Design a protein with these regions (language model features):
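Conserved P-loop NTPase motor "coupling/switch" region that bridges the ATPase
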Residues: 1-64, 257
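SF2 helicase motor core recognition
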Residues: 8-9, 172-174, 214-235, 241-258
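Conserved Helicase C-terminal RecA-like lobe
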Residues: 68-86, 91, 105-225, 296, ...
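A conserved SF2-helicase RecA2
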Residues: 225, 239-312
Length: 312
């Protein structure tokens, strides 16, 4: 499989059950014996037992093992302080939803409530990107956007070509407007981009040095593209699943790349974005011990993890 397990032991079970039905028992038994103890209780003994069961059947082809000639990849996390008006909006919304989210998490209708909780978390993430994603008539600025544009302009002056990823197509539209204002030539790829057009855009970007920036929505263009014409990657906002961002970075850091790839992850300081990074690190320790795949999905967060996201 070319699909990361993404820290979901249910996915691991389903793959084994397809290949060798019954080897990892029924899913109900597997969940009781392994998934709950490992994911929720971080039980080392259960983790080692599962690893022993699957190890003889797992051959991992990692980039580090087979692509020793690849150039370096330098990853830097760049923090930014929210603008005063932006911060006021963030703290006001956080204050309004805290109590409601705590109630929703404690109720039994988990599916419906979970959607409400994730929607609230999405609003916080959007405010970090640009309040205009949340408040349509917002006329103020976004410190992250200013930081992003500063990096982009300096990189272009130094001869770099950039892949710029965001989870939000509406954020890409805001960045697109700024690129036009600065007379920076760019391409954009989202879920609305047709397959034939994707191929043409990729070829043109890799071969035309006048096109300096490729705006890409994380879900639409995070996999399956060869964009070695770029040697810089900017992740405008963090996604729950670190593996998805790593795959997106690998659009540039892959066979055919001859330059060091510089990766910038933009993070709004003292916000939910910092908490998402912490979650990724915590989950990585667990998943490294199983299959060395980093990842967390928002739907898999525990009550404690969700509440921690809302801490100031």
């Amino acid at each position: 499989t070319g699909t990361p397990i993404e820290n979901s032991l249910a996915e691991l079970w389903s793959i084994f059950d397809f290949i060798m039905p019954g080897y990892l028992y029924t899913y109900k038994k597997f969940k009781t014996m392994y998934e709950i103890p490992i994911v929720k209780e971080e039980d080392e003994s259960s983790m080692q037992k599962l690893k022993m069961l699957i190890e003889p059947f797992v051959l991992r082809r990692t980039k580090q093992e087979v692509l020793t000639e690849l150039p370096e990849k330098e990853i830097t996390i760049l923090e930014n302080e929210m603008q005063e008006e932006q911060e006021e909006i963030y703290l006001s919304y956080l204050s309004n939803i805290k109590e409601e989210v705590a109630k929703l998490i404690g109720q039994t209708d988990s599916g419906k409530n979970q959607m409400k909780v994730l929607a609230a978390l999405t609003r916080l993430r959007q405010i970090c990107c640009h309040p205009n994603l949340f408040i349509k008539d917002y006329k103020g600025e976004s410190s992250k956007l200013e930081q992003c544009m500063e990096i982009t302009k300096e990189a272009i002056k130094s001869g770099h070509k950039i892949l710029l990823f965001s989870s939000y197509t509406s954020m890409l539209e805001i960045i697109e407007k700024r690129l036009k204002d600065e007379n920076i030539k760019y391409f954009k790829l989202t879920g609305a981009t047709k397959v034939e057009e994707r191929v043409d855009l990729v070829d043109e970007f890799n071969n035309n040095n006048e096109i300096k920036v490729f705006l890409i929505s994380l879900k639409a263009g995070g996999t399956g593209l060869n964009l070695t014409g770029a040697d810089m990657v900017i992740h405008y906002d963090p996604w729950w699943n670190a593996a998805a961002q790593n795959q997106a970075t690998d659009r540039a850091h892959r066979i055919g790349q001859t330059h060091t790839v510089t990766v910038y992850k933009l993070i709004a300081r003292h916000t939910i974005e910092e908490k998402i990074l912490e979650l990724q690190e915590n989950k990585k320790a667990l998943s490294d011990q199983i299959l060395s795949e980093e990842g967390v999905t928002a739907s898999q967060l525990t009550k404690e993890e969700l509440l921690k996201l809302l801490q100031n």
